[in-house]
């Protein structure tokens, strides 16, 4: 069977400093994410913003600069190359990511949004993601597993994949969904009742995951199964 193209939407990273006359910036793709896609039978390709902009939002909040009609059209042409799409995590979010989330929802394209990608799914569909009240508990780079995760909807795609009701996850974020759009169902929460996983039940595969399953895929089989099922759906 032909391998599906999985588009990973890039993140803008600005490495420039005052002494840098070139003001370099880059578009980043997470290695663990492209590795797990390849390992599960997909071909990972980068989806970059189609714009001449050099300055992007530096926070994980909605960006005021919107895409032009031409930039939207060009980005759609990139998305049409893909059988599925992933919105990455990161410390900043951009309007083009919200646009991708909405486009995938409206066109029933399989999508996973991870961490900031989860935020951009929520924002793209009209909801809100804001600073978490206890970042010291949820931004834990020092441990593999940071807190518990509990499935609250067993009639969900997510539960059919993980097949466990209570388990541990990592946590590397400072923003959380505070206003969930009606298009999404909350299917799992953290042990302090933060929304951990959302999904659109009327779509083929549309998941927003607050934690980072790609960082656990090598050691936690149920987390790898998320990507296996995703790639399988993208083959259809």
Residue ranges of predicted features:
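Active-site-proximal beta-strand elements of phosphoester/diester hydrolases
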Residues: 207-211
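Acidic/charged, solvent-exposed loop-and-adjacent secondary-structure segments enriched in E/D, K/R, S/T
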Residues: 131
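Catalytic core of the metallo-beta-lactamase
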Residues: 197-198, 205
